[in-house]
Curated annotation (Swiss-Prot):
Protein task: Component of an amino-acid transport system.
The protein's name in its UniProt record: Leu/Ile/Val-binding protein homolog 1
Keyword annotations of the record: Amino-acid transport, Signal, Transport
Organism, as annotated: Brucella suis biovar 1 (strain 1330)
Keyword Ligase: no
One of the Pfam families matching this protein, by short name: Peripla_BP_6
């Protein structure tokens, strides 16, 4: 029988809907529970639930316990706005989420109007914190940082390569692709192809034929793992030998399941992996013992709750605007990501992006390893 991870938090979620007397602070977790990006939603949910249990076990925030309500945005902007409006109607004070930048940005505007503070573990589009809103925070980096790292890496390691920049037409995917392209162009490298494809597309044979005809030997992908896995697999099937490089949208072991052995050697940017921090060993073991691998955004979500709880304590208040002020002024906060401070926009002051390579481990499984 599979163990329940951090049991007791699920009870809090149920109680929240029932108007419990003890659950004084309601936190919404806005994520894709269903749809192609549900794996990332699960990471954010598990991380937030585990951290909230830790906070509640220690007495809550300023003497008040935290309850949870979960909203499924299905990675769709319109549904994200519906979730945001439901959270506002339910009296949510703080939101952990959303994942997709295209959902997070419009939802943040609803939250700002309703006095709700939002911390996203995964929205990397710069526009999110460039809106001038009081309530926007993230524990991840930004695509203008990530694209700069990717562009420089490609320039340094693939000189004279013919480069294709491909994206999924979303605020995240196209935004990241454009930032990478911008850096390459600044360095004097012109891409051979720049193409957009549709989210949910399954057959990339026409795209791959175009890549082969152009003699492309480096493919940069701005998008998420479902399409990336298919492109990688179909490139191999159609005999295109090109280096595939992407960003933090492919950091899921599902990528290897979709791409198969062709995933070997794939490169992607992401922040330093907090699972490798010895200070997090006990927590990581706890997740694994419960049958959940805390990869990618799990600990970024955990850190979001830690930041929120410590900022509320520093503010001496659970009022979202007071907590937002404390998050910008009272850091650094002790988190699983390290000592975490936020600037005036709500962006984290964290180490930059690093490069990972997908390799086959001794257990026969593929995983992304920091280079």
């Amino acid at each position: 029988m599979r163990k329940t991870l951090f049991s007791g938090v699920a009870l809090a979620a149920v109680i929240a809907f029932g108007g419990s007397a003890w659950a004084d602070v309601l936190v919404g977790i806005g994520i894709p529970v269903t749809g192609p990006n549900a794996v990332y939603g699960a990471q954010i949910q598990k991380g937030a639930e585990a951290a909230i249990k830790e906070v509640n076990d220690a007495g809550g925030i300023n003497g008040e316990k935290i309850a949870i309500t979960i909203g499924d945005d299905v990675s769709d902007p319109k549904q994200g706005i519906s979730v945001a409006n439901k959270f506002a109607a339910d009296g949510v004070k703080f939101v952990i989420g959303h994942f997709n930048s295209g959902v997070t940005i419009p939802a943040s505007q609803v939250y700002a109007e309703n006095g709700i503070l939002e911390i996203s573990p995964g929205a990397t589009n710069p526009q999110y914190t460039e809106q001038g809103l009081w309530n926007t925070f993230r524990t991840c980096g930004r695509d203008d940082q990530q694209g700069t790292v990717a562009g420089q890496y490609i320039f340094d390691h693939f000189k004279d390569a013919k480069i294709a920049v491909i994206h999924d037409k979303t605020p995240y995917g196209q935004g990241l692709a454009d930032e990478t392209k911008k850096k390459l162009n600044e360095l004097g490298t012109k891409e051979t192809l720049y193409e957009g494809v549709n989210v949910g597309e399954k057959d990339f044979s026409a795209l791959i034929a175009k890549l082969k005809q152009a003699g492309v030997n480096v493919v940069y992908w701005g998008g998420l793992h479902p399409e990336a896995g298919l492109i990688i697999r179909q490139m191999a099937d159609q005999g295109l030998k090109a280096q595939f490089i992407s960003g933090d949208g492919i950091v899921s072991n599902e990528l290897a399941s979709i791409a198969g052995p062709a995933v070997e050697g794939t490169l992607n940017t992401f922040g330093p992996d907090p699972r490798n921090n010895p200070d997090n060993a006990e927590l990581v073991k706890k997740f694994r013992d419960a049958g959940f691998e805390p990869e990618a955004y799990t600990l970024y979500s955990y850190a979001a709750v830690q930041s929120l709880a410590q900022a509320a304590k520093a503010a001496g208040s659970n009022d979202p605007q007071e907590v937002a002020k404390a998050m910008k002024e009272k850091g650094p906060f002790k988190t699983v990501l390290g000592d975490l401070s936020y600037d005036e926009k709500g962006d984290p002051k964290l180490p930059g992006y690093v490069m990972y390579k997908w390799e086959k481990g001794a257990d026969g499984k593929y995983n992304y390893i920091q280079q």
